[in-house]
Amino acid sequence: MADVGWCSGAQATLMLANLMPGPAGEVGPLIAAEGPGLVVTDLSKTYPKSTKPLFTGLSFSMERQGRLALLGRNGQGKSTLIKILGGVLPPSDGTIDWRMSVSWPIGFGGGFQGSLTGIDNVQFLARLYNRPFRDLLDRVDDFAELGAALRQPVKHYSSGMRARLAFGLSLAIEFDSYLIDEVVAVGDARFQKKCEEELFGRRGDRALMMASHDTNLIGRHCDRALIIESGKAKMFDDIEEALDIYTWLRAV
């Protein structure tokens, strides 16, 4: 079982090494293996200052190359679940068994060291994943379109700039699966289209788990859905049925 680590602040970047099935340098496609790529068992989350669980007993699996939507009204725990699966937050209980490589939540910038420049953060990840720094930097620079801002400390970035940097890094390193939390809302329409083409076009053979309120986007790119409601979850193999139920829940 791949351990899922968690931490906060500057140390959060170290979570990336814990998400891989093998050493951090072995981040290549593993989709040829058999069986599910992710198995979650009895997962629960209760925040320290809350007496009521956000969700309890979540159990589900995701196939290699599967495309799973996370649906639910605001406050039901979709983003929290994405962060738990990505190692950003700890679960209160349960197990997470990743059997394929997985990205950190795309667009999540909380793992960057704020006092370092964008370039320095790219260099850190290049060392962590044993990737050529110049190649990684060129990919990030080309995709994120931050220009001279890459030479500035990340703490001076806007939330959108941090998201672009995180998105660029997520796509500069190849993973078997990608965690997505409304990431295509980053930037202007042109950049959003660029994000969609990278994730859903060029990486069409990869697994993804996506939390989004955009039912059209979900309908185009997901084949199953997990609906979270009142702390429980139900899996749907029919994406259209899931979207109908989700639309009804939002209208209640």
Language-model segments: residues:
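ABC ATPase nucleotide-binding domain signature region
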Residues: R64-A69, R73-R127
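Conserved catalytic segment of ABC-fold P-loop ATPases
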Residues: R220-I227
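ABC-family P-loop ATPase nucleotide-binding domains
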Residues: S101, I106-S177, E182-A189, E197
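Helical segment within the ABC ATPase nucleotide-binding domain
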Residues: Q192-G204
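Conserved beta-strand-loop-alpha-helix hinge in the C-terminal portion
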Residues: K232-V252
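Conserved H-loop
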Residues: D205-S212, D214-R220
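A short, flexible loop at the N-terminus of ABC-type nucleotide-binding domains that lies
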Residues: W6, L19-V40, S44-A69, S92
